[in-house]
Amino acid sequence: MVGIVVVSHSNKLAEEIINFAKVLQQEDFEIKNGGDVKNEVYGTNIDNVKDAIIEADQGEGVLVFVDMGSSVFNANQAIESLKGKINAQIADAPLVEGVISAVAANFDDISLEELKIIAEESRNFKKSKK
């Protein structure tokens, strides 16, 4: 199964997104918080993201979700440092909708690439007809 990592500047936000998404989880795969889970601080760093990717990997790759700014930079750096060891990619998707879509679709041996497409399609969800 594809692992999933959520990287947010707020650990509490990432944890709540993960808790909510787990309600839709159909298979056994890892969903990890890539933030600084040991401290109640805001921000991200490369080491925490890298550790979360390693923990989430079950051999089929890891899809990483980020909120903004340094989370994007740190996730890219962490992925680069793991190149050749773990296939990890960032989903260019809204954080909440993307994670929920990916968790709900992560079953039946879906590939990392297929899951990324599904997550990124969440950018097109309309919340209003106006």
Question: Residues of each region from the PLM?
Answer:
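N-terminal loops that bind phosphate or other acidic moieties
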Residues: 2-130
